[in-house]
Amino acid sequence: MIFSSEKELISYYSKFRNSNLNTLKNFTQSNFPEIKLKTNKGIVGQVLESLIGNAPNNDPNPDVLNLGIELKVMPLRKSSNSLVPKERSKIKKINYNSILDESWDTSFLKKKISKILFFLYEQPIGKTYRDWEEFTFLGTLLFDLQVDSYHIIKNDWLEIQKKVKSHLAHELSEGDSKVLGACTSGTGKIEKYDGLYEAKERSYSLKHNYLKLFYLEKYKK
């Protein structure tokens, strides 16, 4: 499906609010029968993206290409009788080789998080992705880098780049930054970079505490 604006995209998804994921899966099967969903940890995102005809893929470009919008899930969980984000949001793996020659303005990370439409859904305590059909889609929340913490995220990225350029990628820690984290990724695989140096695989992420504040400020206002 092609959308002419982010407003149109958000309006489309609003029609599915308060529906459980099983109902949404049935919608996809009726309207996009060619899409085959994979029951793995990414199943919730697959179901929600399939509502616009997106099949599971590994394309590094934004999911809604003409609008430059990335689609990501934001699971929510009850805490003190309120719903809050359950975890950080992983963006993409840090490429220790390509970051050496990138500038912030042309970086792939900046392009990737320019705009993110988060899919909000409740994942009750004690439930795992295997219970996905019971989860309820609650709506969307738009993250716009130009509006939301741009300079902090830019500085966090520059600090990550500085460590990699100094051949200190092995010292990266999520605690080093304010918003954009360098979190552990995968099984801790060792990555080689700049010829001689090694560090454990890490991914860019929007940190958990930041997402909680972002959600409370933007969605709850």
List the predicted regions and their residue ranges.
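Nucleic-acid endonuclease domains
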Residues: 1-65, 70-221
